[in-house]
Regions:
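Short, flexible loop segments at the rims of nucleotide/cofactor-binding pockets, characterized by
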Residues: 37-41, 97-98, 141-142
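Surface-exposed acidic, glycine/proline-enriched linker/cap segments
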Residues: 33, 95-110
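GT-A fold catalytic core of metal-dependent nucleotide-sugar glycosyltransferases
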Residues: 22-28, 44-97, 114, 121
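Catalytic core and acceptor-binding pocket of nucleotide-sugar-dependent glycosyltransferases
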Residues: 88, 92-95, 112-155
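Short glycine-/acidic-enriched loop or helix-start segments at secondary-structure transitions
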Residues: 6-7, 73-74, 99, 131
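Active-site-proximal specificity loops/subdomain of glycosyltransferases
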Residues: 4-56
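Short beta-strand/loop segment that forms part of the nucleotide-sugar
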Residues: 1
Length: 155
């Protein structure tokens, strides 16, 4: 990570009086996965983030893609009771309409509940217990998916 980015995070941490921790991830797992000019191997980091955070005794992860804009306080998401769920997700209506309304069948899903992986509230304990990262990585090793990590998380 460029020093300029680290300095920006340091500035934000001080300005808003919140800790910001930077984790440097070895991209060994993702070196041979598909990537494009807009979807790089760093896209796959979301798959292993819960495993990293679990070591820090964190039980919930609110994940936003970097292209998302939050206009209000996100602390409301901490109120969501996620104890019996692996994750809270948002259905990707726009994708299903633009891409193919039957895309879920192509992926072998049982219903059209295809979600956007750009916003996730993850129950870290259940995510790890259900081996989500390992299953997703195995799928990515075996097949090429048009929407890579988002497709395998939906599967």
């Amino acid at each position: 990570m460029p020093i300029e980015d680290v300095e920006k995070f340091t500035y934000l941490s001080k300005k808003y009086c919140v800790p910001i921790v930077i984790y440097y991830i070895n991209n060994f797992y993702f070196k041979n996965f598909n990537s494009t000019s807009t979807i790089t191997e760093t896209t796959y980091y979301r798959l292993i983030a819960p495993n990293i955070l679990r070591v820090k005794n964190i039980n919930k992860c609110i994940y936003f893609d970097t292209d998302m804009l939050c206009l209000n306080d996100i602390s409301i998401f901490n109120e969501f009771d996620i104890r019996d769920k692996i994750a809270f997700v948002v259905k990707d209506y726009g994708f299903m309409i633009k891409k193919n309304e039957n895309y879920w069948k192509i992926l072998g899903l049982k219903s059209n509940q295809y979600f956007n992986a750009g916003f996730l509230i993850i129950n870290i304990e259940k995510y790890i217990k259900n081996n989500i990262a390992e299953k997703a990585i195995e799928l990515l090793k075996k097949h090429s998916y048009p929407h890579m990590d988002q497709d395998v998380l939906n599967i």
